[in-house]
């Protein structure tokens, strides 16, 4: 998204085209996870239990662990909170901020400030920093805001099922390996922990070896038309107006 705002026109055009395709990928991913959540809720109601593993479903607590993992490693992809490289790329017009043209400022950022979360003296607090150096963090903030929208849709599935559980995004300091939070350990609420505390509790928040083994055990191919794996609900919509039982793929 930042490269789509590039002042180098060939790069900008290419990335804008890629974003159109990426929107489809995001839709498939979000609705796919939603179908897993729907199936879990269906099994919980059918068997009146939170533990749906014996019935071939992935329990909500395990899904939360995977959410914690993927969100935290995705936050690392945006790089350091303060970055001179990002500032230089912005100054050269190679990259921009998300929806740059909609931001009401001078787009030069020489005298602008931005609030960034920092960790000093074993405390997490907000600090005003030069906005030009915090381009990465602004993109990370935009990513977190967008992730919240998807989370609400998954939580709506759970709410509609009448189940007292809600997914939540972990704190941005949780399980980080890049940036200023890489040197500390924090729980999903942002409380700083000692290494001993982290080691003793991390499997409460992240997928354990047993969790990985269980999920992998469910990955059994289902190729018969009209049938679907037991851990995911059927899609709500139709593809090309064909019924769910249609033989979309033929195996020879």
Go through each PLM region and give its residues:
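Long, histidine/aromatic-enriched segments associated with O2/redox biology
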Residues: 10, 36-37
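Extracytoplasmic, non-cytosolic globular domains
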Residues: 20-34, 40, 44
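Extended, helix-rich structural scaffolds rather than catalytic motifs
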Residues: 45-252
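Domain-scale activation on soluble regions of proteins
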Residues: 1-2, 32, 230
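Alpha-helical scaffold segments that form or flank carboxylate-/histidine-based iron centers
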Residues: 10-23
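Helix-loop segments that flank and shape redox-cofactor active sites
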Residues: 1-12
